[in-house]
Regions:
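Sec-dependent N-terminal signal peptides
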Residues: 3-13
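Eukaryotic scaffold repeat domains enriched in small/polar residues
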Residues: 18-282
Length: 282
């Protein structure tokens, strides 16, 4: 618990907040649920309204739209989360109980589906989130069984953790997970942030000061996103420290679903668009 103590202190410190100005708005979505940014500068956006994944360049131009409703490879039924590593894109297809993997041009590679398999330990249903470690291991947030499953990059089951037998670290209201640069697994679970190591051992459980919709990462920058608030953190070794940012020129009715902190910029996803903010010079 001690290594993450600073997190709670800074979440409540308004004196440390930073000011960001709105500089751009791009994308037009029906019900965007998640987005990720590649090292090449492309955004990948999951849209539940159209059951599609959009690839958008840094200027906001749509490069490709892919998917559509269905249950075959390359089709989706509630694409709830999109994540990536250096080479591939991973789409969490909630109502199809699967994780689909694509290359950076959205060409289909593979599909992970275990719900009707013989191994109940490996089975997941209605997945909410997926992320990949630096070693290529895939972590799936299983909402049906309220646990996390770990697979290798080829889909071989490795272990499960965070279930009912995890004691204080049992997941109860899972929302999303990320794998940090130092391979800790952070799970947004209701009003708590639960931290596991790569072997599934519980490290910390932190009570959050408000309800958040998402936790996201861009390299070592981590964000917590609420309806109208965003907190930004950088992780150094085993220390997390979040600060709240002030976002100017945003309509009070705007609801954020996800966010990314990239250098001196913040990208905030809503159901219908992406806002781009830049850090104000003081």
């Amino acid at each position: 618990m001690k290594r993450f103590f600073l997190l709670f202190l800074l979440l409540n410190s308004a004196m440390l907040s930073q000011d960001y100005q709105l500089v751009n708005q791009f994308g037009l979505f029906l019900d965007a649920t998640s987005f990720a940014l590649s090292p090449q500068g492309y955004f990948y956006v999951a849209d539940n309204g159209s059951d599609e994944i959009y690839k958008i360049d840094s200027l906001g131009t749509e490069v490709k739209a892919f998917g559509g409703y269905g249950w075959n490879n390359g089709q989706f039924d509630y694409p709830i989360d999109v994540s990536l590593n250096a080479l591939n894109i991973f789409v969490t297809d909630k109502n199809n109980h699967s994780i689909q993997q694509f290359d950076k041009d959205l060409n289909f590679i593979s599909r992970l589906y275990t719900r009707e398999g013989d191994n109940s330990d490996a089975a997941f249903g209605f997945p909410l989130s997926t992320d990949v470690s630096s070693m290529g291991d895939v972590y799936v947030l299983d909402s049906e069984n309220k646990r996390i499953l770990k697979f290798d990059l080829f889909g071989k089951y490795m272990l499960q953790f965070g279930g009912f037998d995890a004691g204080d670290f049992a997941i109860k209201n899972p929302l999303k997970l990320i794998v940090t640069e130092n391979n800790n697994i952070l799970v947004l679970d209701g009003m708590s942030l639960i931290v596991f190591d790569l072997f599934g051992n519980g490290i910390a459980k932190i009570t959050l000061p408000e309800k958040f919709n998402s936790i996201d990462k861009y390299y070592n920058s981590i964000t917590l996103t609420g309806d109208s608030t965003i907190y930004v953190s950088s992780q150094e070794e085993n220390k997390l420290s979040f600060t709240k940012v002030n976002l100017a020129a945003v309509n009070g009715n705007t609801k954020f679903t996800s966010s990314l902190a990239v250098s001196n910029k913040i990208y905030a996803l809503t159901y219908t668009t992406i806002f781009s903010f830049v850090l104000s010079e003081k």
